Amino acid sequence: MSITKEKKTELITRYGGAATNTGLPEVEIAIMTERINNLTEHLKVHKKDNHTRSGLLKLVGKRKRLLNYLTKVDVLRYRKIIAELNIRK
């Protein structure tokens, strides 16, 4: 379950400001959060899909590392992205 190209560009412009700011931590976290939400919905239906579950756990770990990096760089940006995406930390 991947996200569509339109949804991805929408997330990039919302959290990156411009369509070319794809490397910002906020943009990457937003895209990962969207993918995590899609995979979570998939796993609610397909409970025994262990391959997807392991991919989901890897994705959550990557997002966690990016959030830790953002905490070290700028705490205000971290708090803002946590509040906007409803991520618990």
From Swiss-Prot:
Single GO biological process annotation from the record: translation
InterPro entries linked: Ribosomal_uS15 (IPR000589), Ribosomal_uS15_bac-type (IPR005290), uS15_NS1_RNA-bd_sf (IPR009068)
Q: Which Pfam families match?
A: Ribosomal_S15
- Keyword Oxidoreductase assigned: no
Its cellular-component GO annotations read: cytosolic small ribosomal subunit
Q: Which SUPFAM superfamilies match?
A: S15/NS1 RNA-binding domain
User: Superkingdom of this entry's organism?
Assistant: Bacteria
Residue runs in coiled coils: none
A GO molecular function term, named singly, is: structural constituent of ribosome
Give the transmembrane region(s). Answer: none
Cite the entry's keywords alphabetically: Ribonucleoprotein, Ribosomal protein, RNA-binding, rRNA-binding
Subunit relationships: Part of the 30S ribosomal subunit. Forms a bridge to the 50S subunit in the 70S ribosome, contacting the 23S rRNA.
Q: Name the family the entry cites.
A: Belongs to the universal ribosomal protein uS15 family.
Q: What does this protein do?
A: One of the primary rRNA binding proteins, it binds directly to 16S rRNA where it helps nucleate assembly of the platform of the 30S subunit by binding and bridging several RNA helices of the 16S rRNA.
Name by which UniProt lists this protein = Small ribosomal subunit protein uS15
Q: Which organism is it from?
A: Chloroherpeton thalassium (strain ATCC 35110 / GB-78)
